[in-house]
């Protein structure tokens, strides 16, 4: 579930998703891409549209659409991660109330704010250099919703390190 594809960060997240599929030699199925608008309601509508296809996993471009997706899944009778894996973008402390705990891609918000403030102060102080584009490295926070724990429990002898290597290599 992407964000609005007229917004630069939504395009970047979509491109990252697409590039990851390609890098892993996974098929890109355009009919399984639903554009949302970063609101709960669009995640809910997208959830109903996507879950009818019984996907193995869903990537959602923000936390609010994830809330809507999980509501749709509950109504349909599908369970995360038993029926589908889920990874969301954004991580906030209040997301800890959800079960399963959400696997997220997190931007370094403190670093983003700090670097933005530095650039703004320079600009206010008269710096007329060209605008800069800085790309911050996100962090993948693996929790229950992606299904990793289920994969480990189903792995022969429960060898978590072996299962982790397999997942990271794919």
Name each model-derived stretch:
Residues 1-170:
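Bacterial carbohydrate/catabolite-sensing allosteric modules
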